[in-house]
């Protein structure tokens, strides 16, 4: 029986563990946090005690279901999304989302989904090393040195090592040190974010089946996203620059009060006061893109998820691509009958292209959402109208393909570019 060591037991690592265990691998998962089935405190935001809401689109949903997790249990971790709302001048412009298949995106409770993955990993016989950190990775020896709360180091020997340990991956750092010509790029956005949580989303006018976006009328100052989370609260991510005023470093109460009054004026005064209180009290979080020149080392070590391609959340695809990574990886193992020397290089070949395309689109979406652009809404309607009239000539709505299909990201990027060309032609005409 082959032994797989997975460093990182989050969403990507957990799903990969289930896939491999069901294929007969002996799976060992090293996770620095505690067991979410016993205590979720280390899996949620330390300050707000709530996880940031995330959106699971069709590619993520299909990847989870392919691992044998029942759809009903996955659906119980979130709410189906039927529309997006864009706030401009205090008014919402709604955009209905029409599914192309029998799936709708889910506004997901990350902590509940994590518990679901751990439940099925346990049922599949996965062994976890909770509250253990990875100290060292032997790339050629296929072993990892770990340390638990007792301070005693322990070496785990395997037949493969999977790095699913996030944007600051210890496995990727070992590859950086051990591989010649390994290229790594970490790009910080000029914005960061803080997550604010308000109780009783329904009373505040937020629908649980809708994603809300802010900042379209801010002239590039900020971007925001809000979604109802399963406990009935609304989670609002406020993205601001680190410099200037207002910014994430602003501590002047009148300045930030004016900001919330300007862009969230539709909320009651007590809600805006609570947003102000949380904003001034909470630390900020960075937004980064991580790119690696390769996702593997020989047939020994593989990176997936954020360890390979951490992405700022402006396309809503970071988690979805990570889950698709897990599915793609095991499908390659199946295709090559477990031959890691063939499957690992092909994984890099296939997924590197997709990761780069996804990150480029996320950056482009960030620029759109944080810039004043009233044409944005007309363009979306124009695209749908033109495709309905000339389906063989005019490309479909890229957003619908993104949310409702598993179309490869490089193909979606081509659609986006074609739309740009045709839209410019349409404007000239």
Swiss-Prot record:
Q: What the protein does?
A: Catalyzes the hydroxylation of the 16-position of protoviolaceinate and protodeoxyviolaceinate to form violacein and deoxyviolacein, respectively.
* Originating gene: vioC
Catalytic activity line of the entry: protoviolaceinate + NADPH + O2 + H(+) = violaceinate + NADP(+) + H2O; protoviolaceinate + NADH + O2 + H(+) = violaceinate + NAD(+) + H2O; protodeoxyviolaceinate + NADPH + O2 + H(+) = deoxyviolaceinate + NADP(+) + H2O; protodeoxyviolaceinate + NADH + O2 + H(+) = deoxyviolaceinate + NAD(+) + H2O
Q: What induces it?
A: By N-acylhomoserine lactone (AHL).
Concerning Pfam families, the annotation shows: FAD_binding_3
Functional pathway: Pigment biosynthesis; violacein biosynthesis
Gene3D superfamilies the record matches: FAD/NAD(P)-binding domain (3.50.50.60)
Its lineage opens with:
Bacteria, Pseudomonadati, Pseudomonadota, Betaproteobacteria, Neisseriales
Q: Which InterPro entries match?
A: AB_hydrolase_fold, FAD-bd, FAD/NAD-bd_sf
List the EC numbers from the record: 1.14.13.224
Q: Give the organism, scientific name.
A: Chromobacterium violaceum (strain ATCC 12472 / DSM 30191 / JCM 1249 / CCUG 213 / NBRC 12614 / NCIMB 9131 / NCTC 9757 / MK)
Cite a single GO MF annotation.
Answer: kynurenine 3-monooxygenase activity
Protein name (record): Violacein synthase
User: What residues bind FAD, as annotated?
Assistant: 3-21
- What SUPFAM superfamilies does this protein map onto? alpha/beta-Hydrolases, FAD/NAD(P)-binding domain
């Amino acid at each position: 029986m082959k032994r797989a060591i997975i460093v990182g037991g989050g969403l990507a690592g957990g799903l990969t563990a289930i896939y491999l265990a069901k294929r007969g691998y002996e799976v060992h998962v090293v996770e620095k946090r505690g067991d979410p089935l016993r205590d979720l405190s280390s899996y949620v935001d330390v300050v707000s005690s709530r996880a940031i809401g995330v959106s699971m689109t069709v590619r993520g949903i299909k990847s989870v279901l392919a691992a044998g997790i029942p759809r009903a249990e996955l659906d119980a971790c979130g709410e189906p999304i039927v529309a997006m709302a864009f706030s401009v001048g205090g008014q919402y412009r709604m955009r209905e989302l029409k599914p192309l298949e029998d799936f709708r995106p889910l506004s997901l409770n990350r902590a509940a989904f994590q518990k679901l993955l751990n439940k099925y990993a346990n049922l599949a016989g996965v062994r976890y090393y909770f509250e253990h950190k990875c100290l060292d990775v032997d790339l050629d020896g296929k072993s990892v040195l770990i340390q638990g709360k007792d301070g005693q180091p322990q070496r785990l020997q395997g037949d493969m090592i999977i790095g699913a340990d996030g944007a600051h991956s210890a496995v990727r750092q070992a590859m950086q040190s051990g591989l010649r010509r390994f290229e790594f790029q970490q790009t910080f956005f000029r914005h960061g974010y803080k997550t604010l949580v308000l109780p009783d989303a329904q009373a505040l006018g937020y629908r649980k089946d809708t994603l809300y976006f802010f900042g379209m009328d801010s002239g590039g100052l900020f971007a925001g996203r809000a979604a109802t989370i399963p406990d009935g609260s609304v989670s609002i991510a406020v993205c601001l620059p680190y410099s200037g005023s207002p910014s994430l470093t602003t501590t002047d109460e009148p300045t930030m009060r004016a900001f919330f009054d300007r862009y969230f004026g539709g909320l009651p005064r007590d809600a805006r006061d609570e947003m102000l209180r949380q904003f001034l009290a909470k630390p900020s979080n960075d937004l980064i893109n991580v790119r690696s020149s390769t996702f593997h080392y020989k047939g020994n070590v593989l990176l997936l998820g954020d360890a390979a391609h951490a992405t700022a959340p402006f396309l809503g695809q970071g988690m979805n691509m990570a889950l698709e990574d897990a599915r793609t990886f095991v499908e390659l193992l199946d295709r090559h009958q477990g031959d890691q020397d063939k499957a690992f290089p092909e994984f890099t070949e296939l997924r590197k292209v997709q990761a780069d395309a996804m990150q480029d689109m996320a950056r482009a979406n960030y620029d759109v959402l944080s810039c004043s652009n009233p044409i944005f809404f007309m363009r979306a309607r124009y695209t749908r109208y033109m495709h309905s009239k000339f389906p063989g000539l005019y490309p479909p709505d890229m957003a619908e393909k993104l949310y409702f299909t598993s179309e490869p990201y490089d193909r979606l990027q081509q659609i986006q570019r074609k739309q740009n060309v045709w839209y410019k032609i349409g404007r000239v005409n």
